[in-house]
Amino acid sequence: VADGTDLDLRTRTLRAVHTPGHTLGHLVYHDAASEIMFAGDHVLPHITPSIGFEPAGNRMALRDYLSSLARTLALPDARLLPAHGPVTGSTHERVNELLAHHDLRLAETHQAVLGGHATPFEVAKAIKWTRRQRLFDELDLFSQVMSVNETAAHLEVLLVRGQVTRETSPTGADLYQVPVSQP
């Protein structure tokens, strides 16, 4: 289904809205007349969706996701019908929470790089995770892998914004640092 396609389902019309980030081809379906958004994994009520976790990979998955969240805010507010979790009254309210979360995570990531943590793994270990503020070593293995992937995505956004630089080590690892001209 192409972005912007209206699907006439007799009793309602759903507009397909391309929202890459969780996956490259993710779509939400907005029913403006009924003020409902079928959000899939784009906006979840209690957790942040995993970003760019697919075999094809997308180095800029977080940038795409943040743009998709902004695009969601540009639509009229609607009840949120997510793929996981309860229906909530406002898509916009949850989108604003997700944007605030990622702003905070970007700041924490930048601070960790400022503190000398250079690889996505090192940065992930320097940050607390989940709403319970758990240390990296307290996470199960799958969550650790997801945390390193999320950290790499945040580092890529900081790189595009000019807040960090990236070099490749002789072993092929990505090494990030804050530019000298930046505090």
Give residue ranges: language-model regions:
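Conserved hydrophobic "DFG−1" position in protein kinase catalytic cores
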Residues: 8-9, 29-31, 166, 178
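Active-site/binding-pocket entry motifs
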Residues: 7, 44-45, 86-87, 129-133
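Hydrophobic helix-cap positions at the C-terminus of alpha-helices
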Residues: 7, 72-75, 158
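A short catalytic or substrate-binding loop motif that flags glycine-/basic-rich loops and adjacent residues
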Residues: 1, 20-23, 170, 183
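Metallo-beta-lactamase
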Residues: 13-107
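C-terminal regulatory/interaction regions
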Residues: 111-183
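Conserved beta-strand positions that form and line the central face of beta-propeller blades
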Residues: 6, 18, 175
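Alpha-helix-centered segments that form part of catalytic cores
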Residues: 1-10
